[in-house]
Every structure is written in C-alpha cells, then in structure tokens.
Amino acid sequence: MRIAFREHGEQARERADRSYAAFIRSTHRTMNPGVVYAFAAFAIWGLFPIYFKALHSIGAVEMLAHRMAWSMAFLLIVMTVRRQWKWLGPVLRDKRLLARFAASAVLLSANWGIYIWAVNDGRIVEASLGYFINPLVNVLFGMAFLHERLRPVQWLAVTIAAAGVAWLTWVNGAPPWISLALALTFGGYGLLRKTASLGALEGLTLETMLLCPVALLYLFFLNSHGGSGFEHASLSVKLLLAAAGPVTAVPLLLFAAGARRIPLSMLGLIQYITPSLQLLIGVVIYHEFFGHDQVIGYGAIWTALAIYSLEGVVRARAARV
C-alpha cells in the first residue's frame, strides 16, 4: 500500500513538473522580450526619485553637472566596446545637425535640472504630472510643428487635460509650473530627436559630448572655490554620483531595445509606468500632499490619457486588420 502511494505521489510530481516546464516554455514563446525591455526601462525611470533623494546633500546644479560628466564617461565606454564610432565623423561635419543636437542637449539638460531640483524640493508629485501631460504635449507639438492633424478624439483628450491643468491652477493659485516645464522641455526634446537622423544611443552620446565641457568647467569652478559637495560627501554618495552614468544610459538602452520589438501603441501604454511610480513614491514613501483637489485635477488628466491611449490602440488594431 505504501509503495503504491509512493509511486502515485512520484507520478503526480512528475506530471506537475512536466506541466510547469510546459508552462515556462509557452511563456517564453508568447512573451515578447520587447515588453520586458520597455517595462524595465520605464520602471527604472519611475524609481529615479529614490535615487536623486539619496543625493540630497549635493546641490541640484552640481548633481546635474555630475550626471552629464559621468554619463559621458559611461557612454564613451559603451560606444568603444560596441565599436560604434563610424557615425561621429559625418555628424561633426554636418553643422545643421550639430546645431539641432546642441538645441536638444540644452532642452535635455533643462529637463534633467528641473526634475532633480523638483525631487529634492519635495515636489515629486508635481514632477510626475509633467510626464503624465507629456504625451498630450507631444500631440500639440506634432500639430504645431509637423503639421499633423488632430483627430476629434485627440482634441477631446487635449481639452479634458487642459481642464485638469486649469483646475489645478485655480485651486493652487498658480499654474503647475514644474509640471508644465518638464512636459514642454521633454516634448521639445522629443520633437528635435524625432526629426534627427541618429539613433537613441548615438544621439545621447553626442548630446553629452556637447554638454560635458560646460559640466566639467562648472565642477572645476566649484572645486577651486571650495563649494563642491562632492569633495565633502561620504563614499556612498560619491559612488551614487558616479553611478549616474549607467543610471542614465541603461534605461535608454532598454527602451531602444523594447521600442524596436513592440508596437508603438503598446509602448505608449507602458510609458505611464514611469509617472505612476513617481506619484506613488512621492505620496507613499515621501508623504507629499495629495488631497481631493489634486485627485480631481489629476483625474481629469488621467481620463484624457485613457481616451487618448484607447483611441490609439483601436486605430492600431484596425490598421493591422
């Protein structure tokens, strides 16, 4: 009897093991790695407030300069390992393209600087709103600069979002300047990069090359005048600052890998992981205020985003049929 039960139990375990192995194989077959890459990229960006909060002892401008410098160092290593320097010569001879990337570098540095300052000034919630608004700002920029025509549903989404921003302006007594500045600088950056001929990694490398001399001069000035926070920081803070290179480049590499493998409509939905995580971190971990008035304003913007995203998904599916 015991032998029979033992054999029956072993057979059941073998069947369970085979079923589990089949499940894993089917999951690997059905799961698009692009989804994993994109999810990881947006999740890392969503966790940025925790990273920058850990560097609160360093001033926002100095932190920005370190981010530029360490990003440049890390990207130089990545590009050298991958032997991807053939693009640089033609780009350096193209003055118009260089001017465009100089402009995008300025917008990128402004976006980084505003975000770093907002996080360390206790305005993570307001910063998250900027990235919720950003997709709708992209729609408006496409209409204004690329002569794209807005569909009725897109007009509805933009109108509802504008009503949400107007509500937050009224209850706070001033527009959400940080949110708007982040959305506009990142929207402008995206517009310039959309019309550029370089890939994501090459473009960021060129931008940091253009920004790095200014960053190094500023850091040298701080150090020579005794105002460097890095000089007096603990070892852990210095290591975190040095990690700004991979922290900046790795999610971008993941994003680029994901964007090549999944539809744009899916990428558009996954991108909301970033501001959602930032909002949760601001409210739950750092106890930033999020009252009824904020729920109404953000609710209007979330409704607009839901309308905008669903319309995009429906159109994408219809186009594939």
Please provide the spans of the model-predicted regions.
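Hydrophobic alpha-helical transmembrane segments of multi-pass membrane transport proteins
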Residues: F39, A43-L47, Y51, A102-V119, ...
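Hydrophobic transmembrane alpha-helices of multi-pass small-molecule transport proteins
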Residues: L75, V153-T169, L182, D293-G312
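C-terminal-most transmembrane helix of multi-pass membrane proteins
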Residues: P175, Y272-V321
